[in-house]
Amino acid sequence: MMTYSITNRIRRLRFDHGEMTQQTLAEQAGVTRQTIIALEANKYVPSLLLAYRIARVFDVTVEEVFPLHSDSPEGGAGEAGA
């Protein structure tokens, strides 16, 4: 069975958007600075609503902020090159 993990690119996006502070992002997303800190440290998985709010602040898709990664090895038996 495949398992997945979600990471985030919030810190990089803040830097790319004029070195936006955690406080500014928090205010624009309607959360506390502590929430942004927890998200950046991958200690908290946001609700779908919060994920959309953060994506809108940066004018990107949710997946650009929170990419989904497969924790299972790619490929498998019988998928090797010919």
Report residues per predicted region.
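Short, charged recognition helix plus adjacent turn
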Residues: F66-A82
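Recognition helix of helix-turn-helix/homeodomain-like DNA-binding domains
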Residues: V31-V45
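DNA major-groove recognition helix of helix-turn-helix/homeodomain DNA-binding modules
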Residues: L49-E64
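Short basic helix-loop element that most often maps to the first helix and adjoining turn
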Residues: R9-E27
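DNA major-groove recognition helix of helix-turn-helix
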Residues: R14, E40, F58, H69
